[in-house]
């Protein structure tokens, strides 16, 4: 990642640029369980998702993050009620680094002739689902620039999930509220991630002493995480992904 201190200063002093935070969206589908006509019906979905996520400004204060987002959708089945076809999927969202979220209960309808649009008031399952994870990944990225900087994005994701639980397509939305609760409880991990990224930038710029100081803060955060929430899977994944880099900095 770029120099954290420089990026924070740029965010503070440059005018807001209304561009999306996701510079690249890599999507893969596993549609082997769908019929050939259903595969044709979702043919344009990848392009629509990419356009939706990459052109939407999810947070105006952090408009220059240039995040790469990886999405996998595994289609399991479909069902038709009236003129509406609903797809049931599993999904994986990742920033290609230490943020990864697997979801087993995805349900949405899709009309190939329409574009995707997120309405913060009127809930629709597919834009709502995509916006939820867009905000969660964004929040995790912002947390690496500012202590608890992702709070607003996490709260927006929670609001989306709450609207989902009150909709006709409530499958999985209760669990998505729990994801936000788990993240908010694990304040130690959020401290640790921020300290790691600051320490990494200091190390890359030759400040070994400052880097070691940040790594100590990181270790304290990891200890707090274990005390507060035990063996949390997000903490374990962070350590799995970053352990080699941490070891090289010591």
Task: Describe the predicted segments one by one.
Residues 21-88, 98-101:
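Start-of-domain marker
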Residues 201-212, 218:
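Conserved nucleotidyltransferase catalytic core and NTase-mimicking acidic/glycine-rich helix/loop elements
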Residues 50-58, 135, 139-143, 247:
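Sec-exported extracytoplasmic/periplasmic mature domains
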């Amino acid at each position: 990642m770029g120099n954290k201190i420089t990026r924070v200063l740029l965010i503070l002093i440059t005018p807001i640029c209304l561009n999306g935070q996701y510079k690249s969206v890599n999507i893969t589908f596993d549609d082997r369980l769908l019929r050939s006509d259903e595969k044709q019906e979702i043919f344009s979905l990848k392009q629509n998702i990419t356009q939706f996520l990459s052109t939407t400004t999810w947070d105006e204060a952090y408009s220059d993050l240039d995040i790469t987002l990886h999405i996998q959708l595994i289609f399991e089945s479909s069902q038709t009620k009236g003129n509406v076809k609903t797809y049931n999927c599993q999904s994986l969202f990742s920033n290609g680094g230490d943020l990864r979220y697997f979801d087993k209960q995805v349900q949405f309808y899709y009309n190939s002739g329409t574009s995707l649009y997120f309405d913060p008031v009127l809930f629709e399952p597919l834009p709502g689902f995509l916006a939820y994870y867009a905000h969660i990944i964004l929040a995790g990225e912002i947390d690496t620039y500012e202590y608890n900087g992702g709070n607003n994005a996490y709260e927006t994701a929670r609001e989306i999930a709450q609207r989902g639980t009150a909709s006709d397509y409530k499958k999985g939305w209760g669990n998505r509220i729990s994801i936000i609760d788990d993240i908010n409880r694990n304040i130690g991990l959020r401290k640790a991630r921020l300290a790691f990224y600051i320490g990494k930038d200091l190390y890359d710029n030759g400040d070994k002493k400052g880097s070691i100081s940040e790594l100590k803060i990181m270790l304290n955060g990891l200890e707090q995480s274990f005390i507060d929430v035990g063996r949390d899977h997000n903490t374990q994944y962070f350590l799995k992904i970053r352990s080699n880099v941490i070891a090289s900095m010591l």
